[in-house]
């Protein structure tokens, strides 16, 4: 587990939070610009001046103001990946990777052996073996970030910090690096704090989520639960939707479709070449869900889920509301007009049919 109790006071900003985060997987730190995301990472790394509180990673205490403990950054077992790759331009990829291991390579033979093994593992995990002899200016943005991540994990850190690592990449390069980050998440048995303001990155990569706004924690928890809490900034706007974990339950070869089964029903989506039993994540956006009070007949919408209304909450626009639906163990969002809610006489607890017009495979 990660235990964070952090307080940073500035003239125009205050970061004050207390968190307990999982000891494995990706925790997304989400929020608008100026919410304190990067300040949180810098505090964990020991880079913020005058920070107070307690930082404990597993059994290791990195900071405890009351006990007078505050380890300098170089004594904290962490890897840090920034928006820009920060590779040394005069060194090749291989030389950049080895540069970070100099301290370990000066130690005992056993430490040297372990360091070399970790370096080779990071090269394989990030798929950069063919890039080792290239110079940084010969790499694409996505390749540079993969090298930077490999350099960070080669030191076998207890904690990996990533500060918007995809922010400087164009859409094509972001899509290129997503699978590598997912592999990293699944292969490493360490916690990762991942700062982002991208809902796509959250849904594709994160296991846990913290929502920050103006230096305060607005929500935290498993990502699928946080994404359906209508009081959170993350569900405001066109990106509002549910993240559902399931598996491929069946294939329809004739129509090139795959069925995704989950605790609450199933939906059909276009075949992505996945095999039956494969674990997947799907996203259903609130704007793609409509409701009916009886089972729809003679409709082109193929995905229909039995549900009950959990809540009806005003949306930022006065013409709309956000409806939270319970589908078995899962929650689904639907953005409707107030007129539709009035005409259908929808109310909390009412059974309905949710018609899902579109499903996105995110992982």
Predicted regions located by residue number:
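ABC ATPase NBD coupling module
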Residues: 62-79, 103-106, 110-116
């Amino acid at each position: 587990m990660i235990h964070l109790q952090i307080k940073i006071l500035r003239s125009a900003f205050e970061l004050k939070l207390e968190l307990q985060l999982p000891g494995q997987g990706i925790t997304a730190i989400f929020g608008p610009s100026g919410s304190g995301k990067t300040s949180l990472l810098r505090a964990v790394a020991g880079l913020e001046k005058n920070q107070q509180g307690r930082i404990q990673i597993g059994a290791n205490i990195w900071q405890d103001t009351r006990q007078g403990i505050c380890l300098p950054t170089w004594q904290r077992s962490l890897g840090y990946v920034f928006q820009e790759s920060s590779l040394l331009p005069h060194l090749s990829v291989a030389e950049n990777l080895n540069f970070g291991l100099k301290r370990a390579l000066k130690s005992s033979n056993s430490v040297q052996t372990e360091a070399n093994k970790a370096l080779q593992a990071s090269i394989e995990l990030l798929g950069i073996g063919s890039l080792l002899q290239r110079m940084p200016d010969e790499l694409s943005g996505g390749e540079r970030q993969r090298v930077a991540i490999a350099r960070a994990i080669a030191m076998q850190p207890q904690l990996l910090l990533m500060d918007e690592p995809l922010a400087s990449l164009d859409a094509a390069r972001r899509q290129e690096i997503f699978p590598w980050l997912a592999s990293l998440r699944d292969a490493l048995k360490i916690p990762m704090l991942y700062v982002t303001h991208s809902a796509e990155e959250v849904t594709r990569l994160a296991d846990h989520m913290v929502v920050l706004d103006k230096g305060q924690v607005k929500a935290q928890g498993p990502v699928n639960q946080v994404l359906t809490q209508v009081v959170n900034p993350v569900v405001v706007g066109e990106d509002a939707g549910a993240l559902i974990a399931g598996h491929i339950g069946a294939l329809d070869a004739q129509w090139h479709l795959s069925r995704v089964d989950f605790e609450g029903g199933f939906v059909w989506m276009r075949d992505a070449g996945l095999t039956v039993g494969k674990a997947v994540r799907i996203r259903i956006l609130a704007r793609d869900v409509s409701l009916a009070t009886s089972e729809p007949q003679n409709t082109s919408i193929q995905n229909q889920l039995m549900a009950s209304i959990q809540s009806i909450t005003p949306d930022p626009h006065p013409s709309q509301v956000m409806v939270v639906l319970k589908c078995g163990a899962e929650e689904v969002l639907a953005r409707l007009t107030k007129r539709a809610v009035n005409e259908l006489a929808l109310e909390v607890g009412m059974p309905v049919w949710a018609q899902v017009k579109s499903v996105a495979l995110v992982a």
